[in-house]
Amino acid sequence: FWLDGAGSSGHVYNFSKIIETLRTYQPNTIVFADTALFEYGDARWAGDESGSIEYDNWNVIDRHGYLRWRPVEVDTPLRKYHWVWHPHDESSLKSLDELLNSYENSVGHGGQWMLGVAPNDQGLLDDVDVARLHELGDALRTRYGNNLVRHHLPTDANTARALDGDPDTFWSAPEGSHAASLEVRLPQPTTFNHALTMEWLVEGQQVQKYTIDAWQNGAWKTLVSGGPLGHKKIDAFPAVTAQRVRLNIVTSAGTARIREFQLFSIPNAGK
């Protein structure tokens, strides 16, 4: 449910009553609102409609000393210039590469991706739009369908919980720690160029800074470094071949917990 200010100049709304009614009849509805409507919203705006998050993404925001869990929603239209349908406008349809880039810079930065698809004047989705969505689904399954970490060498039960593909299990750093590492050993040297990491958020977003490292020539080599992780973080880096890989939690606000740590080899990524 959007509390969108577009076109509202000069109008006065009883937001408290609107939200009270919504919670009465649809209590599980997610309310989207900008930070100006801080007390009403469950999700916040990314800041524009480009389809990407270009900043460190923390789910908790602070207004006047009051903290609230408000994940970011990344809204962008399937067609480049508008949200509503226009005839003879197929040329504005975003390319598959543009959509993949948007996915990886929204979902892959811990956001909720809202891709706007408008019905035509017959109340149906245009065939070209539907075809592009099928292409996108196929491409995502191809890119992220072969998790190389699933074929890891035997490890301890704690580490295995971040490698099992089960979102209901997680690896935990030592209780009360503010730094830790999760190491994966593969059966043989393996080439990869993407990592996908998911943080366990039931007890809050904890990871503040991390690196992903590969063991090469007798030492750890950092492939990528980042700030917060959150629900899902997709990192891309030049292809590397290694048998040992680690997620290194450099700093965390509290005990870090990781739902999933996955590696992928994506051909022609970024081209």
Show which residues each predicted segment covers.
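Mature catalytic domains of secreted/periplasmic carbohydrate-active enzymes
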Residues: 2-164, 169-178, 183-191, 196-198, ...
